[in-house]
Curated annotation (Swiss-Prot):
Entry's Gene Ontology BP terms: protein transport
Identification of the protein by name: Nascent polypeptide-associated complex protein
InterPro entries, A to Z: NAC-like_UBA, NAC_A/B_dom_sf, NAC_arc, Nas_poly-pep-assoc_cplx_dom, UBA-like_sf
RNA-binding as UniProt keyword: yes
Entry annotated with the keyword RNA-binding: yes
Organism superkingdom: Archaea
């Protein structure tokens, strides 16, 4: 890969009409249909070219299966579901975990049997 010095890069950007900005990203997550790619401590550059935002991400990626992604359950979500359904904290939390944190799905799962 050819090396460019910063001045050459700026000249090239100006010539091509690119505007770039380096972002202070901590982690980049790319969700695919069957897995998740996670890049910790990436170098992320945002470019604006012809009215389009383009992101360049550089770093080492690791793969995670979708099942490995643990959803963070917020206490406020648990309380909200308890209020809406009249269910216990344990039931509300389990429904949230099964629905991957989707509040609407959790409420539907807890109330479906009651509406039949």
């Amino acid at each position: 890969m050819p090396k460019f010095n910063p001045k050459q890069m700026k000249d090239l950007e100006r010539m091509l009409g690119l505007k770039t900005e380096q972002l202070n990203a901590v982690k980049v997550t790319i969700e695919l249909q069957d897995k998740i790619l996670v890049i910790d401590n990436p170098v992320v550059v945002k470019m604006l070219a012809q009215g389009q935002e383009v992101f360049s991400v550089m770093g080492s990626a690791r793969e995670e299966s979708k099942q490995q992604q643990k959803v963070e359950i917020k206490e406020e979500d648990v309380k909200f579901i308890m209020e809406q359904t009249g269910k216990s904290e344990k039931e509300a939390r389990e429904a949230l975990e099964k629905s991957n944190g989707d509040i609407a799905k959790a409420i539907l799962a807890l109330t479906e049997g009651e509406n039949k």
